[in-house]
């Protein structure tokens, strides 16, 4: 009888504010990153941190969504994975960070993508999804180490909301899950949470 090969289940780390700031500072200071790639990474890290979007969902965003977030505090995005609409919200801090990353004048084409291909003149052209995901994840791993991916933003946001005793149904709705059980699987206490919970 053949034995099933055991595989290690690696720890998936969460990205909290500490890791987010580390990513932003590193990218801003890295002179080897081309300006357009730097802009895409900074935008991606910020939007993922505040919304918990998936990278492929982020690539669907247009400048019109950013304008709505800044003016109204919310916007709706159609998610291709679930074929459903997700409402994104922007508080004061998120708006402040968006204003640092987007130049929005009245002449700006609101149909331009948030994440764009640098080699193309039209900012309506997006980057190949697989290429962008690989680029973002390799940069995250380079800065934070193994165990971190773009999905760590999503997990970190859900975990922080759970730690603040926010109702799981509210977290599920905020993050765009159709099932609360999915949201529960994401809640992953940080080392600090575990240390703080020690009773002996």
Positions of PLM-derived features:
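DNA breakage-rejoining catalytic core of tyrosine-based enzymes
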Residues: 4-24, 83-93, 108-111
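Basic, Lys/Arg- and aromatic-enriched nucleic-acid-binding interface segment
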Residues: 17-51, 55
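Short, basic (Lys/Arg/His-rich) helix/loop patches that form interaction surfaces
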Residues: 27-35, 133-173
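A short, glycine-centered helix-capping/turn motif at helix boundaries
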Residues: 47-60, 164-166, 177
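Catalytic-site neighborhood detector that most strongly recognizes the C-terminal catalytic loop/helix
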Residues: 79-82, 175-200
């Amino acid at each position: 009888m053949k034995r099933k090969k055991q595989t290690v289940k690696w720890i998936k780390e969460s990205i909290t504010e500490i890791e987010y700031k580390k990513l932003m500072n590193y990218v801003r200071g890295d002179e080897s990153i081309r300006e357009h790639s730097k802009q895409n990474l900074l935008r991606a890290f910020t939007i993922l941190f505040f919304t918990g979007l998936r990278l492929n969902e982020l690539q669907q965003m247009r400048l019109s969504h950013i304008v709505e977030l800044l003016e109204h505090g919310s916007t709706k995005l159609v998610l291709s994975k679930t074929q459903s609409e997700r409402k994104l919200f922007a508080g004061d801090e998120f708006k402040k960070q968006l204003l640092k990353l987007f130049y929005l004048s009245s002449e700006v084409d609101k149909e331009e993508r948030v994440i764009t291909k640098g080699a193309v003149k039209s900012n309506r052209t997006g980057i190949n999804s697989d290429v962008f995901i690989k680029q973002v994840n390799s940069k995250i791993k380079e800065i934070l180490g193994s165990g971190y991916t773009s999905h760590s933003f999503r997990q970190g946001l859900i975990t922080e909301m759970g730690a603040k005793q926010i109702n799981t149904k509210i977290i599920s709705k905020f993050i765009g899950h159709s099932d609360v059980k999915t949201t529960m699987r994401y809640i992953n206490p940080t080392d600090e949470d575990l240390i703080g919970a020690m009773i002996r």
